[in-house]
């Protein structure tokens, strides 16, 4: 059991935690007092992860998006493809020109590499605006340990912790985040997007962790990956 006896070092705001690779444990929640997630569709379970594909196959955490949040994950795209890591599908309003709603953390495939996009709707009165931060150059068949953090009205950033890569946005961040939907892991919002990535583990905090807390948690996630043979 990839999560048996696991004791998280950083517990502040921790609402969801799971390690994937066993069919009957895909929706479980190892966070202190955590409530199990709802598995929708038929995830493809692999030895060290799970694929939520095609559209409609996802993990609904049941956790409402908060003003601040921090999300850790280890993922791998075997080919240059999309993987939807976190979203708040069926949110209160739509953003952009497509069907993306609310919070979206995903890769965007290119001809030779992928771009990681982190977008969050922010709200002034009745007007919703999408704030986005992105980083290119991600490769296929590579395990990435990622931390994405949103501090409402101040900043949004992410770090690929095992590759020393990061991107952030701190300007024009005065509006609060647009709330009202539950956060989901995996899935795809278009039927023709295969979302062909592998999720290794996920941890969701409903607070913006400090840099020190992120470093401590990352050390523990790295140790777990090493223990189960996920090469970072």
Question: Model-flagged regions — what are they?
Answer:
Residues 78-81, 126, 152-157:
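Extended, low-complexity, turn-rich repeat/linker tracts enriched in Gly/Pro/Ser/Thr and Asp/Glu
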Residues 24-33, 51-117, 206-215:
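Extracellular glycan-recognition modules
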Residues 168-199:
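Flexible glycan-contacting loops in extracellular carbohydrate-active proteins
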Residues 117-145:
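Short, aromatic/His-centered strand-loop micro-motif at the edge of beta-sheets
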Residues 59-62, 131-137, 171-173:
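Beta-strand-rich interaction surfaces with strong enrichment in secreted/lumenal proteins
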Residues 139-157:
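Localized edge beta-strand/strand-to-loop motifs within extracellular or lumenal beta-rich domains
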Residues 16-20, 70-78, 146-148, 185, ...:
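Short hydrophobic/aromatic patches on beta-strands that form ligand-binding or substrate-lining surfaces
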Residues 1-55, 70, 215-232:
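Extracytoplasmic low-complexity segments
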């Amino acid at each position: 059991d990839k999560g048996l006896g696991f004791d998280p070092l950083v517990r502040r705001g921790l609402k969801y935690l799971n390690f994937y690779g066993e069919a009957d444990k895909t929706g479980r929640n190892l966070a202190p007092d955590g409530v199990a997630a709802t598995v929708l569709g038929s995830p493809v379970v692999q030895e060290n992860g799970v694929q939520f594909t095609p559209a409609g196959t996802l993990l609904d955490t049941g956790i409402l998006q908060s003003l601040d949040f921090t999300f850790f994950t280890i993922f791998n795209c075997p080919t240059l493809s999309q993987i939807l890591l976190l979203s708040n599908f069926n949110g209160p309003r739509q953003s952009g020109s497509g069907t993306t709603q609310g919070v979206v953390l995903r890769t965007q495939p290119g001809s030779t590499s992928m771009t990681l996009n982190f977008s969050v709707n922010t709200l002034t009165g009745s007007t919703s605006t999408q704030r986005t931060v992105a980083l290119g150059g991600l490769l296929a068949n590579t395990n990435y340990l990622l931390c994405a953090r949103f501090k409402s009205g101040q900043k949004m950033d992410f770090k690929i912790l095992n590759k020393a890569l990061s991107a952030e946005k701190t300007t024009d961040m005065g509006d609060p985040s647009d709330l009202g939907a539950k956060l989901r892991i995996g899935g795809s919002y278009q039927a023709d997007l295969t979302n062909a990535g592998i999720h290794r583990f996920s941890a969701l905090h409903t607070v913006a962790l400090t840099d020190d807390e992120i470093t401590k948690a990352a050390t523990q996630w790295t140790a777990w990956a090493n223990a189960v043979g996920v090469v970072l």
